[in-house]
């Protein structure tokens, strides 16, 4: 099948490279000429395991090519994968989607996350929401947990589902509106779980309970599940903040009081402040304090800094007068108020406290005795529960964690 993909960002590039890997002939278009030149040369700026290799494979086989623009011809389907950022009113900005729809004459498949009801205004459009986790995008595309396709024409829906090749994943064929809502409902439910566990962690601190023991007991219940039960500095990234606001705006327009979602958003906005307050309670006044930060991306496995709670925490610390030095394995170049260095040892030098803000697995394997020698005060605040307590304590650190 000849497939066109508009948008060479995180979703679009993964979609294009994976479809080419499955044997389709794929043309990926983007308005950014520099990005198109780089991708045509096999240069992938995104940190996504396996993606660079799939792009190289597609280019070498001739099944994948990149062009500049926002419309494609001579394809059987055009997959729209452009961004839909949040506007000032909390609703998604559909200008990029509408631009592509206005320029495209081929059958269209919407992968971009769009407000519920968007496809209904464009007869013939197929809704095929993406469920890609950053850091696992290639795996999620090639071995999906489910494929959701919404369309007015069941034959067309089945044809789009068939593009994914042989898969054991359940295929959900439904109407456009329901397919659009599946994406929002899924992401917002994950946000609810994350906010719930962060509030539960706060309660554990007041009751002298252990959040790890509590969540271990919870995740063994199949009705609850094991994912999204780790406390942290808050949720962020390109999806959850945007999608929660968009679904809340949709609910308000529909006259539905979505109080649970409002509470989850409010809890998340408060969480970075709670982290900063906890740091201050351990160190005293933050003005003049030297703080080493481990992790800046919104989660491990990606170089994505969009809406990262780590940056929110860092901004609050800087505004209170702290001097910040940070190390993240996927971030280079200083950020406002943050000196970004090339190693954890550099971030630890002279620090009054080390704060883990991203759950990079390599942080568990750091030379903690060496870091203990480099800090001024051996205090470690692990907001992500990534460092084994015995390692930190044997190295001489006093360990503080959310939910303890």
Residue ranges and their predicted role:
Residues 1-404:
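Structural/interface elements that position substrates and couple domains in central-metabolism enzymes
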């Amino acid at each position: 099948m000849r497939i066109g993909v508009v948008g060479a960002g995180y979703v679009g590039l993964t979609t294009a490279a994976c479809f080419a890997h499955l044997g389709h002939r794929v043309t990926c278009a983007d308005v950014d000429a520099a990005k198109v030149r780089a991708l045509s040369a096999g240069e992938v700026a995104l940190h996504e395991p396996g993606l660079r290799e799939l792009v190289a494979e597609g280019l070498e086989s001739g099944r994948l090519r990149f062009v500049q623009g926002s419309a494609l011809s001579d394809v059987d389907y055009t997959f729209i994968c452009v961004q839909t950022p949040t506007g000032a009113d909390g609703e998604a900005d559909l200008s990029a989607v509408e631009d592509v729809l206005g320029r495209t004459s081929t059958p269209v498949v919407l992968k971009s996350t769009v407000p519920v009801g968007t496809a209904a205004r464009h007869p013939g459009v197929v809704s095929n929401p993406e469920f890609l986790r950053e850091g696992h995008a290639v795996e999620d595309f090639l071995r999906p947990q489910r494929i959701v396709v919404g369309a007015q024409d069941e034959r067309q829906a089945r044809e789009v589902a068939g593009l994914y090749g042989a898969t054991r994943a359940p295929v959900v064929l439904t109407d456009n509106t329901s397919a659009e809502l599946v994406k929002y409902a899924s992401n917002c439910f994950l946000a609810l779980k994350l906010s719930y566990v962060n509030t539960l962690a706060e309660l554990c601190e007041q009751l002298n309970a252990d959040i790890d023991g509590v969540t271990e007991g919870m995740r063994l219940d199949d009705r609850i599940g094991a994912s999204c039960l780790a406390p942290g500095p808050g949720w962020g990234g390109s999806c959850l903040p945007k999608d929660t606001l968009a679904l809340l705006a949709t609910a308000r327009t529909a006259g539905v009081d979505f109080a649970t979602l409002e509470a989850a958003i409010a809890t998340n906005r408060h969480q970075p402040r709670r982290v900063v307050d906890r740091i201050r309670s351990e160190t005293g006044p933050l003005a003049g304090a030297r703080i080493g930060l481990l992790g800046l991306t919104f989660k491990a496995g990606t170089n994505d800094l969009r809406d990262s709670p780590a940056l929110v925490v860092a901004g609050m610390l800087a505004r209170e007068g702290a001097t910040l030095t940070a190390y993240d394995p996927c971030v280079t170049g200083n950020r406002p108020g943050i000196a970004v260095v090339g190693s954890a040892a550099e971030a630890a030098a002279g620090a009054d406290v080390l704060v883990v803000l991203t759950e990079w697995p390599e942080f568990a394997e750091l030379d903690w005795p060496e870091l203990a020698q480099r800090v001024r005060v051996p205090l470690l605040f692990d907001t992500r529960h990534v460092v084994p307590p015995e390692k930190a304590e044997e190295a001489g650190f006093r360990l503080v964690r959310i939910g303890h």
